Amino acid sequence: NDLLVQFQSIGPYVLANSYFYQSYYNQGLVTAVSQLREQLQVIIAMGDYLDNAKYGLSHTHSAIKHHMPLMRYKPSTHLESIHKEVPVFIVGNGPSLDDLIPLIKEEADAAIIVSCGTALQTLYKHGITPHFHAEIESNRSTYDWAIRVNAPDYLKQISLISCNGIHPDTCNLYKDVYLAFKQGEASTVSIAELYPKKTFGALDAAYPTVTNFAMNLLTEIGFEQFYLFGTDMGFVDENYHHSKSSGYYSEKGNELYDYTAENNTSLILPGNFRPVVKTKYEFKVSKSVLENVLSVKKAEVYNLNDGAKIAGTKPLRKEDAILVCSAAQRDAAVEAMKQQVFKELDFDDFEKRFNNRYDSNVLIEELSQFHLLVPTELESKEDLTVLIEEQRNFVVKSLLNKNSLLFFYLNGTLNYINSS
């Protein structure tokens, strides 16, 4: 973690000229270096970028304008212990979900049901209405997937939980919306600067999948008992990678596109109920991020899936699941979470703070100056190194001047381009 922080502070673009050297063989060191290499790739590949920053700020502005509440600082202190004890079903769209649907139906009154991403279509087909639906993408794909359910009245029974950058059209589909800032994103950092510290909470591990967001949010709120359905993080059969009731398959159960051709599914992970399963890189990262969250949270997490083994969870066969919670307790916990953990921002006050801090005229002038940094021709590798350093210094200076959005818009994209 110290090395990751150091790379961020000096500029991730230095990865282009970074090398790993081991002076002697040590298995523990080999593993650590391998993990560091993967995490450094994640910093670049999954970092912020111009479009995400631009749309994130626009969508957050819309959310505040339409009175959508945001997660408070240290949210677990705002929820009573009795509510934290209510079980939570995290429902992903992995292949194991098909076999676990009967258990979800059987225990529906004893838990808070949270559907994640494309799992919503599967739950709808089986007559299950979740209390919350989680989404994480800022683009409009979350709207397009949801309307494929083709049941607007069904969606209006469900509360949406998401990050602050969620698309406004997606928000309009649901009964109500509850948001959390996502740490490290331009929209989060730029808006956090407008308010005193300890005003809002922010999620540190809400990536790369929506399951990571849901688990990060709900463990941060303080819930203590989780059951994982369809969060496989891998698959036994490469042709059976999601629930067959979802949009990845036809009504006859055939793949709508060649999943293995589009994804490298050759990675191997230890299995939850079997020695090994296959996976793809995104799921491998997702598993690792989730394991880091569970290592520091006080929660009992049961993994019912025939997928990847997840450190910090307990393998649980569906026939061994026993829940003790009433529907009344569950409903009280849902209501308490909505009322006590999230709060609205005054839009007029927000807009005043924002306009006082960020001047669009300064941004336009800085963009003109930034453009002049680029010479018509680069004659050597040294010229390129100088240019990269000048660009870095320029955007950092803008950040320190505290009157422009230039750093928030360009930092992630520059890091990506200059580390290639």
Please name every model-derived segment.
Residues 1-52, 124-213, 219-221, 379, ...:
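Acidic/Gly/His-enriched mid-domain segments of enzyme catalytic cores or analogous surface patches
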Residues 25-86, 97:
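Aromatic- and Gly/Pro-rich donor/ligand-binding loops
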Residues 69-140:
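Secondary-structure-rich domain cores
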Residues 117-121, 162-168, 305-309:
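Short, polar loop motifs at secondary-structure junctions
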Residues 134-143, 147-156, 180-184, 243-262, ...:
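Acidic, Ser/Thr-rich peripheral helices and adjacent loops at domain boundaries
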Residues 208, 257-308:
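Polyanion-binding loop/helix "lid" in catalytic or ligand-binding cores
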Residues 292, 296-420:
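Long, compositionally biased charged/polar accessory segments in the mid-to-C-terminal portions
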